[in-house]
């Protein structure tokens, strides 16, 4: 996980677009930092990100619940496998796939966010049903710990 690069990019983006930048207080002395609304990474208190942006730390129960160790995968988790890269309206996308039952589903995320994670990172989504597409975010896991969350651009069936 490349925390330093992420923090550099977050600070630079904050100057251009401060309304999307947030530091959320989540569980267990951790913070979720996002700078564009589509992607964020998890930091420890020791990383000193509380004052990264001028608006300080936000406390939203829904964000804290999203990353709660008890609820993040309470309805099941699906491993998403990198499938291929595509381009949509000039934006490079990484396609992740999963197969509930007999139908393959593609989950499209912005490729640029992949640079912050190791090659061994795993991608998961929580699912309410194996028969329905319900993805509120792609969780990035390194060494068994959730380190980030990416919002999908699109989900489809092939």
Regions from the PLM with identified roles:
Residues 1-158:
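DNA polymerase processivity clamps
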